[in-house]
A protein has these predicted regions:
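Glycine-rich ThDP/TPP pyrophosphate-binding loop and its adjacent helix/strand module
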Residues: 144-342, 346, 515-642, 646-647
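Acidic, glycine-rich active-site loops and adjacent beta-strand->loop/helix elements
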Residues: 96-101, 187-193, 215-221, 252-255, ...
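A glycine-rich helix N-cap at a beta->alpha junction
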Residues: 118-124, 205-214, 429-432, 476-494
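Alpha-helix C-terminal capping segments
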Residues: 80-88, 159-170, 202-210, 239-240, ...
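Cofactor-binding active-site loop characterized by glycine-rich and histidine/acidic residues
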Residues: 52-55, 59-207, 225-242, 504-506
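Conserved acidic/glycine
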Residues: 1-78, 84-86, 279-425, 435, ...
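Glycine/charged-rich beta-loop-alpha catalytic/anionic-binding loops adjacent to active sites
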Residues: 59-64, 128-148, 178-184, 242-246, ...
Length: 714
């Protein structure tokens, strides 16, 4: 008896299979027990659907090639084996070649074609992103967060989902289901050479997270073959990650794939630990519609011998399914796919105005509330105002947790910005991470998706760069590219700025880079009261927020920054984003020229100290948030005083401040008596550690006074 017959016998003798009704035009999970014969017929219907769609897309390439796409041809067996077994409480992150996973969970060909043709009713993105880039939030389907094109990008967010599941279980706020949820991350083998994928594996192994990694290995990158791009395959590579069990299988054998997936899912649901399936498969179609297989491959004939559809057809024959029944299935599928394609072509396209929907989720915080300066309190340093804000939030909200490098019990942050929190709330809610900025940032996508509010920290702004890939590709775009389904509710704390001989790797300002990432909000407070109020607002805002916290203001140790210490606001104090603060009012009645200084962060104190040298001629506006920006307040002040300095700690050229100056010039041109001046650091690659050199590079009060004098005389 051959292997497939042996498996069939085992199935018939007692291994019941939870399966689906394969009326392909509707969601097919009916949660009923069925025979292996019915399972195989159902799988064949779906697998033939995937092939028919691939063939149709090729036949109609004059239409379908308008938007780039890839299909699962050759990968169908393992993908269907996975998709058909997932439950509504599960999360799955398919990648761009995984349309068979989508068919397996119940997405119809028509819905997939709406995305292929970028139609308005594309259920995933409303015509905003590519074919087989799903995002799904339906009650009776497995959930799918926004998926991007960057190889391996889904590994960190999906591992964040698993981390969130475990956290909720550990502190008792999960749904307490009989069958616990799992996270599934699908990857191509070539993507596993990405460093961020290793960060995800590291955390899954370290924390023993309930996640299944499915790695589909077709031995191709695009045109690069396996021997060009990897030192070992994923099975060998995973030997370095203690705690992730790996199964290696023939991913073209549906029965073996189904059994393996079933067993792995059972283990993860029950034992809550990570597993990886390494499925070896052929790529039978093009890399994408724009990179055709015949251009560079010489293995196509050999790969065709491992076609999973042919193997499944043979298994049906071995299991006594008549050819006439199979042919009937094929005819039904062909008619359905053709009809769905014709209907999808006729579907409505998005309107131009649809492009502006879902850039940000609506925020509940629209006005300042609470007591900013309660009676009977003494001034509190800025770092403690942040600490107290987070403490109050964690006391009130079990979904709040804090993690990052060195924020845990022993240290509480290198600036003591998280001191006492781990002791008070426990090391499940406040914990250290490895040195993995990408994971720290990107995991918040998954944590947010399961209903948590992660507050995370990058230790210095200088070290945010490894996290920018996740911030830009996943965090900032999730709400927009999921067409409003998946906002990422998170706070990213970033200690920033120079604080006295910090040197080139502990003094940087990075706000201009961040301000060019659309879809995130950016706060940059200059006082303890503002830091606490904005931290609270950030928590209740459903969008991602970057909180830039100036290290030189944390303790007010730098001369002239004493005013950063403020009375700590009460627990209910909140400040809406996009509302600037007037630090110094100027209403000159003596006919002297006046000017306004628009600034933020440390610039508030350079400006405040410089203004003392002038007799009621300076108005100072503290932006407080850089995105959104309070343009109305800025323009109002500039139009009142007719002269303006935009003051920043960053180098001037190509900076946020220079961009703001251009906006001021454009909107206030008729009111200006002088060019808008930008004052900032010198345009050099880094801030030197030597104090003499540092002083030369950075702006300060004395340099600002000179610029003010010149502008007032203009």
């Amino acid at each position: 008896m051959n292997k497939s017959h042996s498996i069939i016998q085992t199935e018939n003798n007692g291994l019941n299979v939870k399966c689906l009704n394969m009326e392909i035009t509707q969601k097919h999970f009916l949660n009923k027990e069925t025979s292996l014969t019915d399972l195989l017929k159902s799988a064949y219907r779906l697998m033939f659907t995937a092939k028919t769609m691939t063939d149709l897309f090729e036949q109609e390439k004059k239409i379908t090639s308008k938007y780039v796409h890839a299909t699962s041809r050759g990968h169908e067996a393992i993908q269907l084996a996975l998709g058909m077994q997932l439950l509504p409480q599960d999360f799955v992150s398919p990648y761009y070649r995984d349309d068979s996973i989508l068919l397996g969970v119940g997405i119809t060909p028509y819905e997939l074609m709406l995305q292929l043709l970028a139609k308005k009713d594309d259920p995933f993105s409303g015509g905003r992103t590519y074919y087989s880039h799903p995002s799904l939030r339906r009650d009776d389907f497995p959930k799918m967060i926004h998926q991007s094109s960057g190889t391996g990008m889904q590994a960190i967010p999906t591992t964040g989902i698993a981390m969130g599941m475990k956290y909720k279980e550990e502190i008792g706020i999960d749904d307490n289901l009989d069958e616990k949820p799992i996270a599934v991350c699908s990857l191509g083998d070539a993507s596993c050479t990405e460093g961020e994928v290793s960060e995800a594996f590291q955390m899954a192994a370290l924390k023993q997270l309930p996640i299944l990694y499915l790695v589909q290995d077709n031995e191709w990158d695009i045109s690069a073959s396996a021997d060009e791009i990897r030192a070992q395959d994923i099975t060998q590579y995973m030997q370095g990650f203690n705690g992730i069990e790996t199964r290696t299988i023939d991913g073209t054998d549906f029965i073996k794939s189904y059994e393996t997936v079933k067993e792995c899912i059972r283990i993860i649901r029950e034992e809550r630990r990570p597993m990886l399936i390494h499925a070896k498969v052929p790529l039978l179609n093009h890399h994408t519609s724009g990179v055709r297989k015949e251009w560079y491959r010489d293995d196509l004939e050999e790969c065709a011998k491992n076609d999973p559809l042919i193997k499944l057809r043979n298994q049906l024959s071995e299991f006594s399914v008549e050819d006439s029944e199979v042919e009937s299935i094929e005819k039904e599928v062909q008619n359905l796919v053709r009809t769905d394609f014709e209907n999808a072509i006729l579907a409505e396209d998005p309107k131009p105005e649809d492009a502006y929907k879902h850039d940000f989720a609506p925020t509940p915080i629209t006005e300042e509330k609470g007591e900013r300066s309660p009676n009977g309190k003494i001034p509190t340093v800025m770092v403690d105002c942040a600490l107290f804000a987070i403490r109050e939030l964690m006391q009130k909200h079990p979904e709040a947790l804090l993690y990052g490098q060195d924020v845990g019990l022993r240290l509480g942050g290198v600036f003591r910005e998280a001191i006492t929190l781990a002791a008070q709330f426990g090391e499940k809610r406040v914990f250290n991470t490895p040195i993995q900025e990408a994971f720290i940032v990107g995991s918040t996508v998954g944590m947010s998706a399961v209903g948590l509010k992660p507050i995370v920290e990058v230790q210095f702004a200088d070290y945010i760069w490894p996290g920018l890939n996740q911030l830009f590709t996943e965090v900032s775009r999730s709400y927009y590219l999921s067409n409003g389904k998946w906002p990422v509710s998170m706070i990213l704390r970033v200690p920033i700025g120079a604080y006295g001989s910090g040197g080139p790797y502990h003094s940087s300002s990075v706000e201009s880079v961040l301000c060019n990432i659309k879809g995130i909000k950016i706060a940059y407070p200059s006082t303890g009261a503002d830091l606490k109020g904005l931290m609270k607002t950030a928590f209740y805002d459903p969008n991602p927020v970057v909180m830039l916290e100036h290290k030189g203001l944390y303790w007010s140790k730098i001369e002239g920054t004493e005013a950063a210490k403020t009375i700590e606001p009460d627990e209910d104090y909140i400040i809406p984003f996009g509302k600037a603060r007037e630090v110094l009012h100027c209403d000159n009645q003596k006919g002297k020229p006046t000017l306004t200084i628009i600034t933020y962060g440390m610039g508030v104190y350079w400006a405040s100290n410089a203004a003392k040298q002038f007799d009621n001629q300076i108005e100072i506006i503290d932006l407080r948030t850089l995105a959104p920006l309070d343009e109305n307040r800025v323009f109002e002040s500039v139009k009142k005083h007719n002269r303006c300095i935009v003051l920043t700690e960053e180098p001037v050229n190509n900076s946020f401040a220079q961009s703001l100056a251009a906006r001021i010039s454009e909107n206030c041109f008729r009111h200006l008596d002088a060019p808008v001046k930008v004052v900032g650091a010198k345009d050099l690659p880094a801030i030197p550690i030597n104090s003499i050199l540092e002083k030369e590079v950075l702006p300060n009060t004395e340099k600002l006074i000179t610029e003010i004098e010149q502008l007032l005389k203009y």
